[in-house]
């Protein structure tokens, strides 16, 4: 970059972020399983990233609803945002819980990736592309469901912990 080309700096993880992605492309695997969008809603520093494979054909309805313009619990964004905002208010107390949950899903994603690739290959060979993509879709939906549930549990815990004040 030329001097002066960048005049403003911004952290990647900011509270007003709607979503973040990390794109993983592995050309030695079939496209359907080799391309993964690790997708996180809300603040990238506080939200889990779920794997959305190139072969994923559908997402939960909550992921199809924009929650950026108003509070709405039919949008997945708010299930993450509530816990994240409450954690931010009392970061010193909430940080350990939130980071433990983030690390859990990060490890789960890394540890299960090879298993997903192998199962995809088995299904592709034995039942065809449609069954293999259905597996990826179900796996993605399961990951999303697990993170939504965990963030809802954190929201309830934080509200209980802070019920007498922040």
Regions found by a protein language model. Give the residues of each.
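C-terminus-biased signal that marks the final domain/tail of proteins
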Residues: 1-166
């Amino acid at each position: 970059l030329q001097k002066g080309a960048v005049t403003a700096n911004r952290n990647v993880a900011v509270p007003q972020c709607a979503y973040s992605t990390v794109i993983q492309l592995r050309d030695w695997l079939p496209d359907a399983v080799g391309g993964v969008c690790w997708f996180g809603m809300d603040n990238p520093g506080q939200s889990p990233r779920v794997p959305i494979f190139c072969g994923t054909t559908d997402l939960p309805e909550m992921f199809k609803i924009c929650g950026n313009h108003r509070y709405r619990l039919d949008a997945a964004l708010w299930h993450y945002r509530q816990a994240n905002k409450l954690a931010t208010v009392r970061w010193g107390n909430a940080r350990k819980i939130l980071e433990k949950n983030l690390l859990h899903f990060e490890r789960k994603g890394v540890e299960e990736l090879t298993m997903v690739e192998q199962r995809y290959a088995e299904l592709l060979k034995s039942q065809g592309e449609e069954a293999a993509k259905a597996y990826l879709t179900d796996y993605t939906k399961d990951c999303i469901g697990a993170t939504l549930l965990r963030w809802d549990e954190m929201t309830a815990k934080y509200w209980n912990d802070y019920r007498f004040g922040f």
